[in-house]
């Protein structure tokens, strides 16, 4: 069974309080921008910048609740995350508040796998953007809720495994670097070893150019 996102989610966006009004900024209200999402984004519960309740009121911002699937709609298109708590956003999003018919994690993994497709839907001359209508008309396979949750769990476990392997590789890289420094020192400590030129310990050979008309 296929379903339109507009039939199973409420699509919402946001806006930016005036930057010239200091009373709107540096409060305790979470307010995100697309730049805060990256390839490792999953559940986010805080923002880089914060606004005040006055900024919320004067700008007419509407909050989206925990569990909302966050989707960047421009600059760039297709970054995704899940809101870990109630927050607000700027105009660079088309976020999806899920109904009881769809699991937010299932929707997150679906959209994460469709970044190229989402980018192909972008419209605009100066920079591409996907509109609310475009997002609402995207279709998604919609199995029973139990199957959605089972799929989400499998992808979550895979994500954990990938992150574990990534951490292990980073630790191994640091181990190799520290071992190298331990053996050879830093770039400023080479005088702890005898030094010589490459020519002293190896024969340097070069190739020649063969004229193709003569030898082929």
Outline where the language-model segments fall.
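Residues that recognize and position ribonucleotide moieties
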Residues: 1, 30, 69, 87, ...
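Non-catalytic DNA-recognition/assembly elements of restriction-modification systems
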Residues: 1-15, 137-152, 167-209
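Sequence-specific dsDNA recognition surfaces
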Residues: 6-21, 35-66, 199-215
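Glycine-anchored helix-breaking recognition loops at helix->coil/strand junctions
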Residues: 15-16, 74-77, 82-94, 108-143, ...
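A short beta-sheet element
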Residues: 33-34, 48-112
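Short helix/loop capping segments that flank catalytic or ligand/cofactor-binding pockets
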Residues: 40-42, 80, 149
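A generic structural signal for alpha-helix starts
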Residues: 102, 145-146, 159
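Amphipathic alpha-helical coiled-coil segments
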Residues: 158-169
């Amino acid at each position: 069974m296929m379903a339109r996102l507009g039939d199973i989610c409420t699509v919402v966006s946001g806006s930016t309080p005036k930057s010239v009004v200091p009373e709107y900024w540096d409060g305790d209200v979470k307010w995100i921008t697309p730049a805060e999402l990256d390839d490792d984004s999953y559940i986010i519960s805080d923002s880089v910048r914060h606004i005040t309740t006055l900024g919320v009121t004067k700008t007419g911002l509407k909050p989206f609740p925990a569990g909302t699937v966050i989707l960047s709609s421009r600059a760039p298109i297709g970054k995704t995350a899940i809101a870990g708590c109630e927050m607000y956003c700027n105009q660079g999003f088309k976020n999806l508040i899920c109904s009881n018919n769809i699991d937010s994690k299932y929707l997150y993994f679906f959209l994460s796998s469709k970044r190229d497709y989402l980018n192909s839907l972008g419209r605009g001359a100066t920079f591409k953007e996907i509109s609310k209508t475009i997002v609402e008309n995207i279709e998604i396979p919609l199995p029973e809720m139990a199957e959605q949750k089972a799929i989400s769990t499998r992808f979550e476990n895979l994500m954990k495994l990938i992150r574990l392997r990534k951490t292990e590789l980073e630790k191994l890289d640091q181990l190799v670097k520290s071992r190298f420094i331990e053996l050879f020192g830093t770039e400023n400590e080479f005088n702890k070893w005898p030094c010589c030129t490459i020519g002293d310990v190896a024969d340097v050979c070069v190739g020649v150019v063969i004229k193709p008309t003569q030898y082929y």
